[in-house]
Amino acid sequence: MVVVSVPAEVTVILLDIEGTTTPIAFVKDILFPYIKENVKEYLQTHWEEEECQQDVSLLRKQAEEDAHLDGAVPIPVASGGDVQQMIQAVVDNVSWQMSHDRKTTALKQLQGHMWKAAFTAGRMKAEVFADVVPAVRRWREAGMKVYIYSSGSVEAQKLLFGHSTEGDILELIDGHFDTKIGHKVESDSYRKIADSIGCSTNNILFLTDVTVEASAAEEADVHVAVVVRPGNAGLTDDEKTYYNLISSFSELYLPSTQSKV
């Protein structure tokens, strides 16, 4: 087994989600397809609710901004007309946005509400790799703080870790960051995270599967290890040589405690 020693000054472990704590396949093959497969039923069930109407209004506004794009799907203004026709327009718009991998606030808001309903109803559980929870428990016992940094919203992060295949594991997480603090490929984001936590950047070890993020973190003087999981993007030979690589959280070692973390 490969063992990566955690530098003695590290007191915070910062975790990516997709491809690090959670299989990419769960996000790609379960989480996002769930939206496409269930959006019509969700809208029909919740159409009269204020939250749903706010989501639709935001999507309509986005559709107006997208009107100049090829293939964009308009959403008609609410009237006394056919509700099913309105719902179908929203379904078609969502499908179009997702097929183009759009990350609009309007789309993310509806997706977040749909996932919340699915998780709380027990229709879905978030997968985490088997090595994650035991390792995080050991890190915390060793005095480490553990934070999440993901492009998914903090609300979505809490849904995932609150309804995981390992149960509700939110108690193991000290805090959450999303792109409101900055994008993961920008080094300044990691400085802001350190400021928010109240530590130096070199007190942080960031675990991610994306080398562009690892590089940005390193520029901010954050320690990094690149996580190699099934389904993750391949690494170049140079990246394999340059970065500390782990395929399991159990491969991290805390010299200060003389125990594998």
UniProtKB/Swiss-Prot annotation:
Its EC number is 3.1.3.77. Its cofactor is Mg(2+). Binds 1 Mg(2+) ion per subunit. It is an enzyme of class 3 (hydrolase). The keyword Magnesium applies. It is found in: Cytoplasm; Nucleus. This is Enolase-phosphatase E1.
